[in-house]
């Protein structure tokens, strides 16, 4: 049958898909001069940040103690340019006025944020070093820090989270969420950039972990695979829609351990030095030092 016989079907589909009511809420109107967030550019940003934080493990593998300053300098310059463009894309994308081009003020703001982010890279390296140390110390199968940095999906997910969290704190819209969802796709770990997580954090056998937007996690906390730190319920507004931004996820204090497939829901507190066993649901506060495990089935 000739393709021409299908022309009316294709035309009808185009007409229906072009009706404004059909794409209401699904359409982003592009304006000339407004950059859009780029998945490729954001991947490059993450790889550059990794190459700066973990020199020699990512990026140029020929870096040594004599050339490290040069390589970091080159990567920082590239990172600044790429990050400025993507931050600008986020600022323009998140603007309430979709019909106006990005302003010079927004361009200056994007460059300022990129510079401040880069100024925080030494602190990001310091805290990620504690995460690597926690993973190494907590896993007898790990033979070196290099193995942890190169191989462990948890370190990849935590690195993305810490980069994204810093950008979120600096006021960047959209981009932080894309960065953590990239790690979600790669590793199966869903860490919202809004969560606050202390140092020496590790996820053993890192996959399937969910950490919600308003979670607060102290220092030296260890999660195992499949742990969910989620919301128990969503308060609704007068229109029946979830109220955004309210605290609704758990607080884990220092030195907490949560074993595999445990589910902890709601704005509850797991006290310092507590242990939560695997495959259980927790919806109430857990005292400091407590040990919560499954109860034995009654005969």
PLM-predicted stretches and their roles:
Residues 1-178:
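Terminal amphipathic alpha-helical/low-complexity segments used for targeting or macromolecular assembly
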Residues 183-299:
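Structural signal for interior beta-strand "rungs" in well-ordered beta-sheet cores
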């Amino acid at each position: 049958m000739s393709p021409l016989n299908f022309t009316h079907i294709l035309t009808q589909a185009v007409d229906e898909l072009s009706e404004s009511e059909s794409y209401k809420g699904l359409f982003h109107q592009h304006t000339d001069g407004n950059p859009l967030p780029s998945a490729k550019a954001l991947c490059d940003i993450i790889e550059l940040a990794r190459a700066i934080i973990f020199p020699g493990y990512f990026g140029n593998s020929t870096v040594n103690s004599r050339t490290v300053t040069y390589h970091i300098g080159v990567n920082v310059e590239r990172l600044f340019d790429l990050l400025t463009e993507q931050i600008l894309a986020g600022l323009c994308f998140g603007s309430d006025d979709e019909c106006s081009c990005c302003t010079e003020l927004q361009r200056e703001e994007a460059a300022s944020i990129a510079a401040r982010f880069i100024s925080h890279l030494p602190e990001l390296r310091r805290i990620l070093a504690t995460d690597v140390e926690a993973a190494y110390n907590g896993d007898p199968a790990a033979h070196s820090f290099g193995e942890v940095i190169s191989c462990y999906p948890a370190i990849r997910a935590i690195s993305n989270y810490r980069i994204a969290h810093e950008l979120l704190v600096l006021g960047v819209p959209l981009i932080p969420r894309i960065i953590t969802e990239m790690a979600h796709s790669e590793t199966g770990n869903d860490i919202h950039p809004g969560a606050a997580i202390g140092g020496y954090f590790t996820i053993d056998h890192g996959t399937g972990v969910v950490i919600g937007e308003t979670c607060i996690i102290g220092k030296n906390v260890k999660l195992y695979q499949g742990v969910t730190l989620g919301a128990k319920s969503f308060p609704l507004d007068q229109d029946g829609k979830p109220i955004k931004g309210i605290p609704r996820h758990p607080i884990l204090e220092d030195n907490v351990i949560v074993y595999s497939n445990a589910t902890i829901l709601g704005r509850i507190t797991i006290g310092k030095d507590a242990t939560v066993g695997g495959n259980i649901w927790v919806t109430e506060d857990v005292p400091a030092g407590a040990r919560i495990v499954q109860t034995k089935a009654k005969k």
